[in-house]
């Protein structure tokens, strides 16, 4: 299943693989359904999110066995959601096989994926809808969202098995799939939003500071100068954007640096969004943040468990003994934050994996006319994580009708 996602992009593969799952699901009892769906989901997630190993082992100093164990436990836990729903549906839902294939199984899969994204902190990563970003079904995303795209994939897969099991004639299945795809194609031709204001020119700055050096104190000045020089070389734009934690330090420790940047960019009337940490000097709490040098800031609301904070610290505090991730005791920002206004546009900002949650992006709409996501995917350098993240960002842009 992972091959259907970026960077492989064998998008067509999601249809026969879901059909294969539905075929075995249809033939078994409730316990068998649980096992089949759990194994299918486990395999998808083990191969799909194996990039977590890169951050834990190469950059977090974790023993390899511990890093692998974390990935296996996370994947196994996430796989329980669709498996449990499959068990309950198979045991208690008494309908004919055609309805099961076209309605019950797709609805069950959709419900399970939605549940994975909202339970505890949520981890809405390997969702089938992301495989269709360049396909006709993506036309449904601006109207119904990514989950609907995944549900329609499942309906098409169910129709394939219905034909194989002689529950539906091939021409009826072709009409059904044709209507789904044709409607998606038609919806994709519609522009659901209109331009607001003048076009703005944006420069994205990437300092390419190796992750293993980024947090070293001797690299601090070099990092600041690298970003300053790159910015001044590209200042003839409306907006410059730096990555997440481009400055690996607190805002209150670099005031002169930020002031000098604002002054240097004033003549060209350029705004700058900077990724760094902001510390509340009264409470001692600190936040993964983005600020505009011309005023305004955003503090990350949806934190990464085990990376930015330790959930259930009293129970799993031992985690800190096995892994060393810098700045991993961060606080979440308030829900009701004002939008940043940069280059004359209200901007919806997200940091790192916040953009995998469509509900988090939607709360800045419709006021935000532009979406900005800043990330430090160097934690996963050498893996396919950044390509998967890029596909997810494209889906958020498609859903919202905004550039990201």
Where are these regions (language model features)?
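Membrane-embedded alpha-helical bundles of multi-pass enzymes
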Residues: 1-191, 232, 382, 393-397, ...
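Soluble catalytic domains of enzymes that build or remodel membrane lipids, polysaccharides, and related
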Residues: 190-404
